[in-house]
Amino acid sequence: MESLGRGLASCALLLAVAVSIGAQPYDNDYTPTVDHPTFAKTTGPVVLIDEAHNNYHTCEGRYKVLCELLENDGFIVESSKSPLSAKSLKKADVLVIANALNAQNVTDDENWKTPILPAFTKDEIDAVEKWVAGGGSLLLISDHMPFPGAIADIASRFGVVWQNAFAFAADFNFAKAKGNPNMINFGLSADASGGIGHAHPIFQGRNAASVAQSVTSFTGSAFRLKPNSGVQPLLELGEGTMLLYPMASQEQTMQTPNASAVGLLQGAVLEQGEGRVAFMGEAAMFAARIAAFISPGFKMGMNNPDAPYNKQFTLNLFHWLSNNL
């Protein structure tokens, strides 16, 4: 751990950073159009959205736009409120787990406190691992603390060690945190925010029209890989990025433990058995929301003009997961 420094005043200032979640509805004015759908309407692969584990992102809520985007591309999108098992996964081609949480960690004020308990049972993790080996594809998404702690066990099964922390861009100004959106841009060239993208078909797309030159995240978390995991880095955190490790999500001060995030990841992919897995350390990049806690009307996700390729990156990601890329 290291000192916060980097422009903080000497007083014990509670950081007014852009990490407060609060009420963030989806953007009613944003329509996730797809000019050239990959599949005819309702004929594509089945995408199952996990909603059985107190998920912060669901098709009816914060992932409404994501689900609409996938449907507009021809995917069949279904929500599941059943425990993960061979039966519940049988018809799914892609399983999306986004910001799951153990019931004991759910709070009305969203000031989540440690310890963070697992969101999944061993039987559920076993079922998912077997399903992936047999050809299923998993998209595991975890925002900042507390969500990494809740999915640590299932991530570990696939060789990923998730940090129960908040990730910060290299150009984030802690002394002027209020109103700072903390956006990290991952392209194939160096970026002032500290994001480093790794070449992969998810960036390249199927043709020139589907290239995603970059993808932008909004805070989130980070993870490292176990030795010989076989996991391929996709979104890497570079020089100047850092992590904060609060004991309570909305209680961050100059004394909050912190560390460099250099070399850690916000995105990675894995081919295991007949299946595929993608790990993403930020959820809003796949959404389209309004984050008034940053500034009135602030657009967070694929609706943000400074994240022009997030929609295409999202489509490419699901094409890769469904073996259509």
Regions found by a protein language model. Give the residues of each.
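Bacterial N-terminal signal peptides that target proteins for export
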Residues: 1-11
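Bacterial N-terminal signal peptides
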Residues: 10-18
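Short, surface-exposed patches at the edges or C-terminal ends of soluble domains, predominantly
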Residues: 21-325
